[in-house]
């Protein structure tokens, strides 16, 4: 699920945040970015 990390990772409104990427990688994604305080896995 692309949004599996949204509730687990807090992040800044804009830009990139390491916890988001780490969470996404744990779920098998390549990484993630933060958009509007939410983590989006890529």
Curated annotation (Swiss-Prot):
Predominant location: secreted
Protein name stated in the entry: Potassium channel toxin gamma-KTx 1.10
Reported tissue expression: Expressed by the venom gland.
InterPro entries for this protein: Ergtoxin, Scorpion_toxin-like_sf
Disulfide-linked positions: 5-23, 11-34, 20-39, 24-41
PROSITE patterns, per the entry: ERGTX
A single GO cellular-component term on record: extracellular region
Keywords in alphabetical order: Disulfide bond, Ion channel impairing toxin, Neurotoxin, Potassium channel impairing toxin, Secreted, Toxin, Voltage-gated potassium channel impairing toxin
A molecular-function term among this protein's GO annotations: toxin activity
Family listed: Belongs to the ergtoxin family. Gamma-KTx 1 subfamily.
One Gene Ontology biological process: envenomation resulting in negative regulation of voltage-gated potassium channel activity in another organism
Subcellular localization, as worded in the UniProt entry: Secreted
Organism expressing this protein natively: Centruroides margaritatus (Central American bark Scorpion)
Chain's role: Blocks human Kv11.1/KCNH2/ERG1 potassium channels (reversible, IC(50)=3.4 nM). At high toxin concentrations, block of Kv11.1/KCNH2/ERG1 macroscopic current is almost complete. Does not accelerate the kinetics of the closing process and has no effect on the activation and inactivation kinetics of the Kv11.1/KCNH2/ERG1 channels.
Domain commentary: Has the CSalpha/beta fold, which comprises one or two short alpha helices connected to anti-parallel beta-sheets stabilized by three or four disulfide bonds.
Domain of life assignment: Eukaryota
């Amino acid at each position: 699920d692309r949004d599996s990390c949204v509730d687990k990772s807090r992040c800044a409104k804009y830009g990139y945040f390491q916890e988001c990427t780490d969470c996404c990688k744990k779920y098998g994604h390549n990484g993630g970015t933060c958009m509007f305080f939410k983590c989006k896995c890529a």
